[in-house]
């Protein structure tokens, strides 16, 4: 069985990569049984609750992350160093229940996937 990892490495607003990444996950979820989602770099900003993108005339798609569990996508990982670099920590109240991993263990996890798709 092929395993696919989606990596979100860009901030949520200003570009459409986050929304496109979610759309891609939902589109291929019926094809691949093992899909995991990783948040690294500015991608960790996708996880912050109570964002108000309408103030910059952007659509708030981040609430769509909450339906990942309906697609049986439960392996969600975040880079601890990326959180700390942005003044966040694993005690923050994020929109998802995520496993926070150090950079080394995050790389070890990613090494197990057949395909890695970056958004």
Swiss-Prot record:
This is Protein TusC. Keywords: Cytoplasm, tRNA processing. GO terms for biological process: tRNA processing. The gene is tusC. SUPFAM superfamilies: DsrEFH-like. Its main location: cytoplasm. It is found in: Cytoplasm. Belongs to the DsrF/TusC family. InterPro entries: DsrEFH-like, Sulphur_relay_DsrE/F-like, Sulphur_relay_TusC, Sulphur_relay_TusC/DsrF. GO terms for cellular component: cytoplasm. Heterohexamer, formed by a dimer of trimers. The hexameric TusBCD complex contains 2 copies each of TusB, TusC and TusD. The TusBCD complex interacts with TusE. Part of a sulfur-relay system required for 2-thiolation of 5-methylaminomethyl-2-thiouridine (mnm(5)s(2)U) at tRNA wobble positions.
